[in-house]
UniProtKB/Swiss-Prot annotation:
Pathway: Amino-acid biosynthesis; L-methionine biosynthesis via de novo pathway; L-methionine from L-homocysteine (MetE route): step 1/1. L-homocysteine binds at I436, G437, S438, E489, D604. CDD domains: CIMS_C_terminal_like, CIMS_N_terminal_like. Belongs to the vitamin-B12 independent methionine synthase family. Pfam families: Meth_synt_1, Meth_synt_2. The active site is at H699 (proton donor). It is an enzyme of class 2 (transferase). GO terms for biological process: methionine biosynthetic process; methylation. It comes from the Bacteria. Its EC number is 2.1.1.14. PANTHER family: 5-METHYLTETRAHYDROPTEROYLTRIGLUTAMATE--HOMOCYSTEINE METHYLTRANSFERASE. This is 5-methyltetrahydropteroyltriglutamate--homocysteine methyltransferase. It catalyses: 5-methyltetrahydropteroyltri-L-glutamate + L-homocysteine = tetrahydropteroyltri-L-glutamate + L-methionine.
Length: 760
């Protein structure tokens, strides 16, 4: 019998973001629900055909979502938040939960969207389920069953995928005090029984049930709940229990006791778990080996994976399945849409469509197909060639990396000395006012950027247009009487992509989009070689802006860890090494900025916290190199050069030591929505440097009043000495318009001026 091959899921957005554009048309009222559903059906059909035509044993159904697969599960379970429930749920119900509903919408009262948060340690976001003690679950949303029928009628052998009951509960939150959401499990399991029975009646043989929390360090109460859950939901379908993103070493002894028929493990994230899993695998279970990495863009070394899995095949026989490591949701759709890439670079990559082919080819090779074995060897050759390419592994970069010592991470003076130098050089008032960096990306800016990229504007013409926007931003800030100005970042489409386009070692794509949430997609750059800065990146823009004003101009950089976390990294070197390469490049930029007369430089690190590994025991090692990378970037600054960093998190307690270890002169943080509660972590830690707690929620169109900002600043002054407080918005203002921005900043400046007298 042939080796069973499958993937855990396929991108839902379409090759050219067709779903994104259709959703946004629907939300604007430009197409109706029938047209939207027709487009969705076409995307699903294409995805299933890709899998079946490649030779996979199963086509995966249930991976399509109009907004988010966790939200789809919420509706499947009849668990719509009460504020959005309105009889039988439909697509509009789903969108209200994900996006919220304004007061004027549909003639009804407004209702807030459910929270959104990161899906484990990926850059995908899910809609957080909400739980109350009286919640009931009733299968009422037919999408899964309809899509299974679609696939069966189209002639595909279907494997539905379903988020498991324990992961669904774990990933949610209680919205009332005094109860534990785990107590809802018995009620939830009844709904899962109904789902599996329905799938069995449709002729389904195998169901993929995703329980990614089995890769975490679970509390005993959660780990112990699995045995009951999988006894109760047992039905006539076979269950493949699916884990990903890390090893199951902490939960394996619990897993092998479960009443299921197979286990999927992520061998890309954790290859070392294979031997232990095989040793403990129950005799009747299948083992799905996730060897094709679903989280990246790199071609799989099929020759190496064949050699690795061949003895497993000999031992397990037909019980060995071959699969992607996780859903291909996290990979761009199709490499064939990138004709501009060189043949060499293209030979290094595999996007979702190509990864499907990899899984199928490896399966045939394990079945002894000689042509497939030879094809695996040929396919893997570019990976071997790349290892010795000097334009990938650059001697000059390696030499700099080898020269990194502890002294390279240290500023030349401690904070107290630096603060005295900076006070003298900068001449700033009490409660200095500034912004986080970006100003509104107007329609004019976007039109001019597009014209430049399509050749309709020359480099000179584009630069002149950008200087016009910078001059306008400086003029507006001076009129507002802000103390520290920024140039506004008109030249940047994205805070990471801009640096990727200007550093050697990156590759950008045209259609390398992946879903972030809902209709929002991102196009991460790809680290393809050792990273170095060949010329200054931001100096021209910052110095031009400084030439227009006598006030201090802040240079703006994206930090090394954030660039790393928001790109596709290399697989052949460690993340630590990539971060160090980025840090050295940014260090040179810091030196050039200060030598050009820029006295304040901000190095944004919004992603340090989200880069944390899933297992807490791995946190310290990560935080050590992440902090060191930031410090390498900043340590070339002279004592009189003030280094800022910006972070936007909802929780600082677990990383406050590391935040302090960054030794930034000023940290600006997002606090307005928490009413300054986030400052408790800094107060308890006795954070020694300067802090700018955000007083303007830039995610909302609401304009904060002067009185509101004053109240927030007074709260902040109770937790942080006023001599160390800055006044600023929560985040950059790229997504706001100028009217909102100027009105809010006028109130911010007025509040700061008033409190300088009161709090002095």
């Amino acid at each position: 019998m042939a080796t069973t091959t499958h993937i855990l899921g396929y991108p839902r957005i379409g090759e050219k973001r067709e779903l994104k554009f259709a959703l946004e048309k629907y939300w604007r009222g430009e197409i109706d629900q029938a047209e939207l559903k027709q487009l969705g059906a076409g995307l699903r059909e294409k995805n299933w055909n890709t899998q079946t035509e490649a030779g996979l044993s199963f086509a995966t159904a249930g991976d399509f979502a109009w907004y988010d697969h966790v939200l789809t599960t919420t509706l499947l379970l009849g668990h719509t938040p009460k504020r959005h429930a309105n009889g039988f749920p439909d697509l509009d119900t789903l969108f209200k939960v994900g996006r919220g509903q304004s007061q004027s919408g549909c003639g009804s009262a407004g209702a807030a969207a459910s929270d959104m948060t990161k899906w484990f340690n990926t850059n995908y976001h899910y809609i957080v389920p909400e739980f109350s003690k009286d919640d009931a679950f009733e299968v009422s949303w037919p999408q899964l069953f309809e899509e299974v029928n679609e696939a069966i009628k189209a002639g595909h052998k279907v494997k539905p995928v379903l988020l498991g009951p324990l992961s669904y509960l774990y990933l949610g939150k209680e919205v009332e005090e005094g109860f534990d959401r785990l107590t809802l499990l018995p009620r939830l399991l009844t709904a899962y029984q109904t789902i599996l029975s329905k799938l069995a009646s449709q002729g389904v043989e195998w169901v993929q049930i995703d329980e990614p929390i089995l890769s975490l360090e679970l509390q005993d109460k959660w780990a112990d709940a699995f045995k009951l859950a999988y006894q109760v939901i047992r039905s006539d379908v076979k269950v493949l229990l699916t884990t990903y993103f890390d090893s199951v070493s902490d939960t394996l002894d619990k897993i092998v006791e479960l009443n299921v028929d197979g286990l999927h493990i992520d061998l890309s994230a954790s290859p070392e778990q294979l031997d232990e899993v095989i040793a403990k695998l129950p005799e009747h279970w299948v083992l799905s080996a996730g060897v094709v990495n679903g989280r990246n863009v790199w071609r799989t070394d099929l020759s190496t994976q064949f050699a690795r899995l061949q003895p497993v095949k000999e031992r397990l026989g037909d019980r060995l399945w071959v699969a992607s490591s996780c859903s291909l949701l996290h990979s761009p759709v199709d490499l064939d849409l990138e004709p501009a890439l060189s043949d060499e670079v293209k030979s290094w990559f595999a996007f979702a469509k190509q990864k499907v082919t990899e899984v199928a080819l490896l399966g045939r090779a394990l079945d002894g197909d000689r042509n497939a074995i030879l094809a695996c060897e040929t396919y893997s050759q570019p990976i071997q060639d790349r290892k010795t390419a000097t334009h990938v592994n650059k001697p000059q970069v390696q030499e700099r990396l080898n020269s990194i010592t502890a002294s390279l991470t240290q500023r030349s003076a401690p904070y107290a000395e630096r603060a005295a130098h900076q006070a003298e050089v900068l001449g700033l008032p009490l409660l200095p006012t500034t912004t986080i960096g970006s100003f509104p990306q107007t329609g004019d800016i976007r039109v001019q950027r597009s014209a430049y990229r399509t050749g309709k504007l020359s480099q000179t013409e584009y630069n002149q247009a950008l200087k016009g926007h910078i001059a306008d931003a400086v003029k507006r800030q001076e009129a507002l009487d802000l103390d520290v100005l920024v140039h506004g970042e008109a030249e940047r489409n994205d805070m990471v992509e801009y640096f990727a386009e200007n550093l050697a070692g990156f590759q950008t794509t045209k259609f390398g989009w992946v879903q972030s949430y809902g209709s929002r997609c991102v196009k991460p750059a790809i680290v393809v070689a050792d990273i170095e800065r060949e010329k200054p990146i931001t100096v021209e823009w910052s110095t031009y802006a400084q030439s227009l004003t006598s006030k201090q101009m802040k240079g703006m950089l994206t930090g090394p860890v954030t660039i790393l976390c928001w790109t596709f990294p290399r697989e052949d070197i460690t993340r630590k090494e990539i971060a160090e390469q980025l840090a050295l490049a940014l260090r040179d930029e810091v030196s050039d900025l200060q030598d050009s007369g820029i006295n304040i430089i901000q190095i944004d690190e919004p992603a340090i916290r989200e880069g944390l590994p899933l297992k807490k025991r791995d946190h310290d090692a990560y935080l050590q190199w992440a902090v060191d990378a930031f410090k390498i970037s900043a340590a070339s600054a002279k004592p009189e050069t003030q280094i800022h960093t910006h972070m936007c998190y909802s929780e600082f307690n677990e990383i406050i030591d590391s935040v302090a270890a960054l030794d930034a002169d000023v940290i600006t943080i997002e606090t307005s929505r928490s009413n300054m509660e986030l400052l408790k972590a800094f107060e308890a830690f006795n954070y020694p440097n300067e802090i700018g707690p955000g007083v303007y929620d830039i995610h909302s169109p609401n304009i904060p009043t002067q009185e509101w900002i004053e109240a927030l600043l007074k709260k902040a002054a109770e937790k942080v000495p006023v001599q160390r407080l800055w006044v600023n918005p929560d985040c950059g203002l790229k997504t706001r318009n100028w009217d909102e921005t100027e009105a809010a900043l006028a109130n911010l400046v007025s509040a700061a001026k008033k409190l300088r007298t009161e709090l002095a």
